[in-house]
Amino acid sequence: MGLLVFVRNLLLALCLFLVLGFLYYSAWKLHLLQWEDSNSLILSLDSAGQTLGTEYDRLGFLLKLDSKLPAELATKYANFSEGACKPGYASAMMTAIFPRFSKPAPMFLDDSFRKWARIREFVPPFGIKGQDNLIKAILSVTKEYRLTPALDSLHCRRCIIVGNGGVLANKSLGSRIDDYDIVIRLNSAPVKGFEKDVGSKTTLRITYPEGAMQRPEQYERDSLFVLAGFKWQDFKWLKYIVYKERVSASDGFWKSVATRVPKEPPEIRILNPYFIQEAAFTLIGLPFNNGLMGRGNIPTLGSVAVTMALDGCDEVAVAGFGYDMNTPNAPLHYYETVRMAAIKESWTHNIQREKEFLRKLVKARVITDLSSGI
């Protein structure tokens, strides 16, 4: 009799466990599906701030884009002289063509990073799941989570993201690039020797371990070093760098990485993974793949930087963006001889989708393309 009671109780406990497990799994799948639905369904015309009778694409962008300012924005910015920074311009223009646009997240992770549900529930590159201890250890040493005080105090910020594209060569855009308040550079793209075309100023350099400059003398003074974490090893690498520990070449990197970054901890930041997630699934519409890194669903660092700038800058420009796949022998980057055809070998990026996204922004004057490569 005692055995029967034990078996009955065991079965009841097992059933309860299965029911709770099913409910938890269902809730998780529903949470994930909000991303998949937004990328696979035509949005209703009266949802998310959209205007009735206006046509939008499957992501929520206006179908008919032009370079004319909406009437209310034309009035708002009518008295600004040419070249003057227009407060709120980029976000206002973005909202006009993409009503779902919002600015809920800080540029960089801070000591409250655990409260952000959007990144807490995804593994890198789309979130921080499993990285709490590493991030906490890094932030306990860096202790700085914002731009510099001088930049934070600006009433209006003009930002430019300098891409690495060969389209920058011989454009002589250096002085125009240096006129911006914030100059964002990507990975190991050099400045020295290319100042005439790419400028000499660097405010932020965003990179990941394999993309970081390996020679300490290449790093610019007075710039912030920003990690974009695409895998858990990237956060581990940054901890090594911050604590000045030895970096092992066998720590899961796909090429050699920098073993030293000549920056003090307060000059180091961690890019909020929200912007990788937002660029991939909300703005570009890349495959969701259950929130995991997969074929063709990782945005390039350039598109991620644009997404970040739309959130943190009043005006946004780009230079050195654009891959012309019809000219396979053109230089891929302004600083080396690798040809355009090499980009086709990438399995993580969807260049065509990104081009469509960036063209929308340029056509609607959300961003300015100085080198006309998009």
Curated annotation (Swiss-Prot):
This is CMP-N-acetylneuraminate-beta-1,4-galactoside alpha-2,3-sialyltransferase. It comes from Rattus norvegicus. GO terms for molecular function: beta-galactoside (CMP) alpha-2,3-sialyltransferase activity; N-acetyllactosaminide alpha-2,3-sialyltransferase activity; sialyltransferase activity. GO terms for cellular component: extracellular region; Golgi cisterna membrane. Its EC number is 2.4.3.6. GO terms for biological process: ganglioside biosynthetic process via lactosylceramide; protein glycosylation. It is a single-pass type II membrane protein. CDD domains: GT29_ST3GAL3. Found in all tissues tested. High expression found in brain, liver, kidney, colon, heart and lung. The lineage of its organism: Eukaryota, Metazoa, Chordata, Craniata, Vertebrata. It comes from the Eukaryota. The soluble form derives from the membrane form by proteolytic processing. PANTHER family: CMP-N-ACETYLNEURAMINATE-BETA-1,4-GALACTOSIDE ALPHA-2,3-SIALYLTRANSFERASE, SIALYLTRANSFERASE. Residues 29-374 are lumenal. Its main location: Golgi. Glycans are attached at N79, N170. Pathway: Protein modification; protein glycosylation. The chain crosses the membrane at residues 9-28. Catalyzes the formation of the NeuAc-alpha-2,3-Gal-beta-1,4-GlcNAc-, NeuAc-alpha-2,3-Gal-beta-1,3-GlcNAc- and NeuAc-alpha-2,3-Gal-beta-1,3-GalNAc- sequences found in terminal carbohydrate groups of glycoproteins and glycolipids. The highest activity is toward Gal-beta-1,3-GlcNAc and the lowest toward Gal-beta-1,3-GalNAc. Disulfide bonds join C159-C313. InterPro entries: Glyco_trans_29 (IPR001675), Glycosyltransferase_29 (IPR051142), GT29-like_sf (IPR038578), Sialyl_trans (IPR012163). Residues 1-8 are cytoplasmic.
